[in-house]
């Protein structure tokens, strides 16, 4: 097999041109086989095989650098840089990351995981190169989805201003190029990338600039775009920004891609290559259902059906159901997502109430301020977003929502440890970054019924509130404990005295396990479902001091600025002396891996917490 010849970076350059297509097919089959076992981002990687091969053939890595936006489409890059064996443990505990990691390989130029960052990072590397007097090529690869994020345009605007050599590749997998459109696109691409065109353009501009008043003439020429040119030549939006546009280019034609990359290296200033690819290319189920195979669980190759289909509802399913009920009950309820209607569970709401559903693209900042405007206009907006992505809209939460005390509900999915996507996606900071904002309220449900109750409470609150819930199966235990939700009030599940286990959200289930372990050791333990992180139930905390010897706080959030620190502050403010143990996530980023294994690693499983308690007694 040709793929067996790829053992390290630049081995691809030893492959004969006539074998490029065969190698691409082998890479696709390798990816399908491996990801069917481990799970991972399949669709985007199948679509980027030829593009990645072309980049490795046209560039001199690692001196030249590639920055992958989001980074989930970097699997072929990992294969071509000698990491084939890592796919056996892809995204597994202590295994290979599913994203670029500088600590994993010198060929990974920049860590990514969130969208729309690659152009900014690439431009920074470009200016570092210039300041050091180097002549390397820097390429940022960004998808059409990521180009909906405002940061990408901020970076493009800056790139045009800096007038330094920089290549941006737009990997557009929104649609395939049909035969008719393909012919026209190829014709226009040949004109735009022809050496003569580039030489003529540069020659004219240089000649004019050498004359008195030439700069003004050049600027007027650049602004003078005829209506015909606007209609006929694609990419004029980028050209008007001062970024040279090349394309559209067939993203599955390796030699054509190499040619346009070589031409882009000749362009003075920033250049954008528009590449058209097909998401899921080469695997029928992924071509037919690209969204399903964006982030795939292990699946049967022949059918594409998940190997272990879910049989019980997860928290996203519960949220989806209650959203539809809320929408039916109140016509003022509107739903907002940042390009994730499926992942956040809003697809059903969208189908039922299309006029009250808003997908704003990968634009979390806009999503939050848009929600603030809706709230100011009398609506009841619910922003459904992953915890790690809400970080991108911190100023909007503070400035646009909370200062005005607007009733925006933040439904925070993937809160806590999420597992295989690693550091960039762990939702372990939201208690901390939200709790310091005046007017913000934060709560977390212990089980699926409480999530439904909290969402109903949140919509009725008339103030900013975040409801955070984890990834995975919705806990169905403790069904008999369903006291009405009251602002800032905890729920006593069991009161025995001895050790008071104050647990937040997903940690209530763990508290049950800790209590059982303590019983085995002869200790009594109470379980308190904290419910609210802000405001905390100070009355419950002080009450626990009366008949308990120790307070233990349990949270799936970093300890710094979290629930435990708020409990300690309460005790200090009221001059209460009692032994305390805080169980949470340490001051460190948590890598990828199975959530249960990660909890053991950081001491957040029931056994580790129990041992910590016993040491303190």
Where do the PLM segments sit?
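Long, well-ordered, tryptophan-enriched scaffold segments
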Residues: 3, 174-319
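Non-catalytic terminal/interface segments that mediate subunit docking, oligomerization
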Residues: 65, 277-390, 396-406, 463, ...
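N-terminal amphipathic, basic-rich helices that act as targeting or association modules
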Residues: 1-80, 239, 243-258, 267, ...
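Glycine-/acidic-rich phosphate or pyrophosphate-binding loops and their flanking alpha/beta elements
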Residues: 259-262, 294-295, 304, 314-329, ...
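A glycine-rich helix N-cap at a beta->alpha junction
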Residues: 86-96, 161-175, 196, 402-414
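Peripheral docking tails and interdomain loops at the edges
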Residues: 298, 302, 306-311, 419-421, ...
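Structural signature of the thiamine diphosphate
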Residues: 217-285, 407-412, 431-480, 606-617
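Cofactor-binding active-site loop characterized by glycine-rich and histidine/acidic residues
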Residues: 41-162, 315, 332-333, 337-338, ...
């Amino acid at each position: 097999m040709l793929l067996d010849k790829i053992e390290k970076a630049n081995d691809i350059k030893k492959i004969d041109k006539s074998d490029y297509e065969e190698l691409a097919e082998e890479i696709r089959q390798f990816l399908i086989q491996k990801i069917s076992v481990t799970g991972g981002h399949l669709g985007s990687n199948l679509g980027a095989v030829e593009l990645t091969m072309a980049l490795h053939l046209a560039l001199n890595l690692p001196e030249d650098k590639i920055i992958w936006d989001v980074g989930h489409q970097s699997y072929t890059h990992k294969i071509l840089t000698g990491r084939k064996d890592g796919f056996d443990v892809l995204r597994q505990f202590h295994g290979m990351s599913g994203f670029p990691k500088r600590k994993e390989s010198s060929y990974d130029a920049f860590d990514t995981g969130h969208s729309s960052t690659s152009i900014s990072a690439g431009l920074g590397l470009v200016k570092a190169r210039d300041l050091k007097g180097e002549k390397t090529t820097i390429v940022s690869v960004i998808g059409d989805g990521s180009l909906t994020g405002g940061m990408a345009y901020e970076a493009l605007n800056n790139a045009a201003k800096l007038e330094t050599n920089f290549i941006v590749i737009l990997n557009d997998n929104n649609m395939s190029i049909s035969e008719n459109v393909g012919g026209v696109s190829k014709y226009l691409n040949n004109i735009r990338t022809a050496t003569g065109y580039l030489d003529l353009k540069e020659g004219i501009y240089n000649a004019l600039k050498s004359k008195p008043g030439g700069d003004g003439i050049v600027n007027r020429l650049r602004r003078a775009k005829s209506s015909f040119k606007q209609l006929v030549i694609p990419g004029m939006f980028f050209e008007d920004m001062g970024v040279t546009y090349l394309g559209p280019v067939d993203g599955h034609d390796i030699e054509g891609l190499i040619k346009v990359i070589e031409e882009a290296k000749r362009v003075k200033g920033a250049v954008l290559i528009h590449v058209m690819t097909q998401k899921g290319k080469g695997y029928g189920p992924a071509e037919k259902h690209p969204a399903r195979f964006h982030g795939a669980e292990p699946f049967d190759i022949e059918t594409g059906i998940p190997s272990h289909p879910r049989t019980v509802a997860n928290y996203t399913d519960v949220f989806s159901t209650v959203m539809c009920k809320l929408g039916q009950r109140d016509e003022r309820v509107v739903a907002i997502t940042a390009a994730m209607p499926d992942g956040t569970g809003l697809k059903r709401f969208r189908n039922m109430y299309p006029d009250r559903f808003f997908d704003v693209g990968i634009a979390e900042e806009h999503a939050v301020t848009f929600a603030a405007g809706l709230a100011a206009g009398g609506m009841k907006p619910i922003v459904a977003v992953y915890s790690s992505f809400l970080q991108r809209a911190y100023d909007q939460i503070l400035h646009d929502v909370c200062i005005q005390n607007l009733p925006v509900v933040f439904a925070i999915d993937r809160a806590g440890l999420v597992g295989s996507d690693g550091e960039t996606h762990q939702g372990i900071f939201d208690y901390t970054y939200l709790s310091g904002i005046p007017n913000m309220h934060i709560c977390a449900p212990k089980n699926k019924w409480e999530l439904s109750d909290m969402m109903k409470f949140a919509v009725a609150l008339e103030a900013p509130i975040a409801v955070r819930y984890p990834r995975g199966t919705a806990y169905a235990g403790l069904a008999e404990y369903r006291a009405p939700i009251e602002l800032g009030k905890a729920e006593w599940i069991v009161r025995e005295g001895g050790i008071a286990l104050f647990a937040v959200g997903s940690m209530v289930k763990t508290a049950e396990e800790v209590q059982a372990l303590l019983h085995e050791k002869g200790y009594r333990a109470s379980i308190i479902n904290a419910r609210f992180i802000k405001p905390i139930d100070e009355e419950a905390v002080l009450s626990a001091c009366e008949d308990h010897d120790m307070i233990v706080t349990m949270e799936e959030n970093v300890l710094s600025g979290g629930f435990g620190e708020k409990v300690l502050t309460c005790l200090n403010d009221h001059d209460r002396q009692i032994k305390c143990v805080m169980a949470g996530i340490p001051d460190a980023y948590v890598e990828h891996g199975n959530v249960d294994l990660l909890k053991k690693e950081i001491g957040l499983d029931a056994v580790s917490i129990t041992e910590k308690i016993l040491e303190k007694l």
